[in-house]
């Protein structure tokens, strides 16, 4: 049997218990066709990048699956029919990841930000002083400036 990672996006206006019931429903479909569910991760209610079927948020759920292709195809067919499922994606993998997925692990290596992505300028406001990369200024032509 092949290994798959499956991500499911459910509508925002249903409860977390209903999302869990959906996952159990699809688990039953998969097991009836000879497949097995592995790890199930609920990522919770997260904002969508763009609106999908008039929804701005969705419940994300990741499922590790060990099943034949026919069982996965039947589960996906059932998901297309269900109105509570906004989107899903099934990807075949060589092996399942151990531990938490990348979405749930905190990134401690991310530097602390003070709400500003720009590098700090020298103190003193707008005056940057001598830039150092330019040579000295040429003298002004005083005769041309007076007549104009």
Curated annotation (Swiss-Prot):
Stretch list, region Disordered: 96-148
GO CC annotation, single: cytosolic small ribosomal subunit
Originating gene: rpsF
Family: Belongs to the bacterial ribosomal protein bS6 family.
Described purpose of this protein according to its UniProt entry: Binds together with bS18 to 16S ribosomal RNA.
GO biological process, one term: translation
Protein name: Small ribosomal subunit protein bS6
Gene3D superfamilies per the UniProt record, alphabetical: 3.30.70.60
Matching Pfam families: Ribosomal_S6
CDD domains associated with the record: bS6
Annotated signal sequence range: none
Assigned keywords, A-Z: Ribonucleoprotein, Ribosomal protein, RNA-binding, rRNA-binding
MF terms in GO: small ribosomal subunit rRNA binding; structural constituent of ribosome
């Amino acid at each position: 049997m092949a290994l798959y990672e499956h991500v499911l996006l459910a509508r925002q206006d249903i409860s977390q218990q209903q999302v869990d019931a959906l996952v159990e429903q699809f688990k039953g479909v998969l097991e009836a066709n000879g497949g097995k569910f592995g790890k199930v991760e609920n990522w919770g209610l997260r904002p969508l990048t763009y609106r999908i079927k008039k929804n701005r948020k969705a419940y994300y759920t990741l499922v590790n699956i060990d099943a034949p292709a026919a069982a996965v195809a039947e589960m996906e067919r059932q998901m297309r029919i269900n109105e509570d499922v906004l989107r899903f994606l099934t990807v075949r993998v060589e092996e399942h990841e151990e531990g938490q997925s990348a979405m749930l692990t905190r990134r401690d290596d991310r530097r602390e930000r003070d709400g500003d992505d720009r590098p700090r300028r020298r103190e003193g406001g707008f005056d940057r002083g001598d830039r150092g990369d330019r040579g000295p200024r040429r003298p002004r032509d005083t005769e041309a400036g007076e007549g104009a």
